[in-house]
Design a protein with these regions (language model features):
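PLP-dependent aminotransferase-like
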Residues: 1-42
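Hydrophobic beta-strand scaffold residues
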Residues: 16, 72-73, 196
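Active-site phosphate-binding strand-loop segment of PLP-dependent enzymes
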Residues: 25-81, 94
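Conserved active-site segment immediately N-terminal to the catalytic lysine
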Residues: 88-100
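Active-site C-terminal subdomain of aminotransferase-like
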Residues: 100-184
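Conserved small-domain helix->loop->beta segment predominantly found in fold-type I
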Residues: 186-199
Length: 199
């Protein structure tokens, strides 16, 4: 799924460098070393590679971005609520997730969370997009609206799900519940006749 970021850069003629990893392998400091101090301005990463189950080291990536003053955009669709992720503590500029996966609602809503510096960046630029104009979304959000009619039913389900998570002890409790489910699943499949490809 990380390749989709590459496709987006290609479609919009954005100069980019792809760090292509072998399937199932994690990102290491050695992968990042050649890019230290090279003037990169943005780092796009999916926190968890859904197809292989590899969870990337977001602390490693965050530290690299801070050292190099790089804007960090994290796709956490398949890890949101399933793995610990503190956007503010990590200094992540933009976090993308969806209504499905661990949020456990039907697919159909994309959620983009902007840190204050990301809001400032969006508002200071001319945006040439009708249906994906974050400046319009922010402006409409000030009055509790969206630029276009959203999937209202799914928004109501997200609202109910967030209340459910809060009542059950909050995000940390949900992370622990997911970790227990994952450990149980891994234990039950470890003797089955197949190979797990992730490191």
């Amino acid at each position: 799924f990380g390749h989709r970021f590459v496709q987006l850069c290609e479609i919009h003629d954005i100069p980019h460098t792809e760090i292509a990893l072998e399937m199932g392998h994690k990102l290491t400091a050695e992968h990042l070393a050649p890019y230290e101090g090279q003037g990169y301005t943005g780092f796009l990463v999916n926190l968890d590679e859904t197809s292989t189950g590899v969870l990337y080291d977001i602390h490693l990536i965050s530290q690299f971005c801070h050292r190099n003053n790089i804007f960090l955009v994290v796709d956490s669709i398949s890890s949101f609520l399933a793995d610990p992720f503190n956007m503010q503590a990590l200094g992540v500029d933009v976090m993308i997730t969806g209504s499905q996966k661990a949020l456990a609602c039907p697919p159909g809503i994309s959620i983009i969370v902007l840190a204050p510096q990301a809001v400032e960046r969006v508002c200071s630029r001319e945006i040439k997009s009708m249906y994906f104009n974050l400046k319009d979304a922010l402006k409409n959000g000030e009055r509790g609206q969206t630029p276009f009619t959203p999937a209202v039913g799914i928004l109501r389900q997200i609202n109910a799900r967030l209340k459910e998570i809060e009542a059950a002890g909050g995000v940390e409790s949900e992370n622990q519940r997911m970790a227990a489910l994952a450990a149980d699943f891994r234990e039950k499949i470890k003797n089955l006749p197949f190979t797990i490809v992730s490191q």
